[in-house]
């Protein structure tokens, strides 16, 4: 195995990724072991526990932003511009780490479902193992889950992969079509700015309100725009960097611990 080239790593991205992992793990753990019923409730304020238990879900969208940043930064570093992206190489590099793991996970979950293992068997009337497998491999599991009800947790977490990989498939084609025009950035801006509108317009479906495709793609588009901005702008002055960092921290804290007030 080749050693990791740490000179090419971005410490800020690594920090955000690590923070996202911790928050998502806490969120999923708290579904089974509510934080308000743990010893933490004796020491931590209720608002903090609410943020960790419920708004930790928002860390998934932080993952989306990071993904958008990375899938844009890598082709820019190799080619210099998105209009000349190598589509085959892009798909090959993206599929290598994901497809084997996805197939292994689907195979394992299918075996558990066939064995009727508790918490791994479809319980909703409209759900079937075949339909679930097809939606996972066809990258529309978020749509399937919205139409049929909550899937067992092992399957349900694949909703975010469905959104991300659909964007991943479309991204190089859009770059080839719009990369040589002035339409790419405005299109990404419109998509990124659609998040509040999308959230405000969905009330009838709890699952779709959380897992709708447009909302996830808007977060990924935000990461794409960030990568393009970093590419175009020179390194900021230290004071500007500190203020930008402070603004980002305040924004993250507001989303995680005052999310209800923000979206009302």
Predicted region positions:
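Aromatic-anchored segments of alpha-helical transmembrane domains
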Residues: 22-29, 111, 142, 190-201, ...
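Helix-to-loop transition at the C-terminal end of transmembrane segments
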Residues: 30-37, 111-124, 201-205, 262-263
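Interfacial loop-to-helix transition and helix-capping segments at the boundaries
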Residues: 10-11, 48-60, 123-135, 150-163, ...
């Amino acid at each position: 195995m080749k050693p990791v080239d740490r000179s090419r790593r971005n410490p800020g991205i690594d920090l955000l990724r690590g923070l996202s992992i911790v928050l998502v793990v806490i969120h999923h753990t708290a579904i089974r072991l509510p934080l308000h019923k743990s010893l933490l409730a004796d020491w931590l304020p209720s608002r903090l526990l609410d943020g960790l238990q419920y708004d930790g879900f928002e860390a998934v969208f932080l993952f989306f932003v990071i993904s958008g940043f990375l899938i844009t930064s890598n082709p820019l570093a190799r080619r210099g511009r998105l209009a000349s992206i190598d589509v085959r190489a892009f798909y090959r590099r993206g599929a290598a780490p994901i497809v084997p793991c996805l197939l292994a996970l689907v195979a394992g979950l299918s075996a558990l479902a066939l064995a009727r293992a508790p918490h791994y068997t479809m319980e909703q009337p409209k759900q079937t193992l075949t339909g679930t497998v097809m939606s996972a491999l066809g990258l529309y599991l978020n749509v399937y889950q919205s139409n049929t009800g909550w899937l067992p947790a092992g399957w349900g977490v694949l909703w975010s992969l469905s959104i991300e990989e659909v964007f991943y498939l479309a991204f190089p084609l859009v770059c080839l079509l719009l990369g040589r025009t002035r339409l790419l950035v405005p299109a990404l801006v419109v998509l990124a700015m659609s998040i509040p509108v999308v959230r405000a317009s969905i009330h009838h479906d709890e699952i779709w309100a959380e897992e709708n495709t447009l909302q996830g793609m808007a977060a990924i588009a935000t990461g794409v725009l960030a990568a393009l901005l970093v590419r175009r702008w020179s390194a900021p002055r230290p004071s500007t960097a500190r203020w930008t960092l402070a603004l980002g921290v305040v924004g993250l804290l507001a989303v995680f611990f005052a999310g209800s007030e923000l979206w009302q």
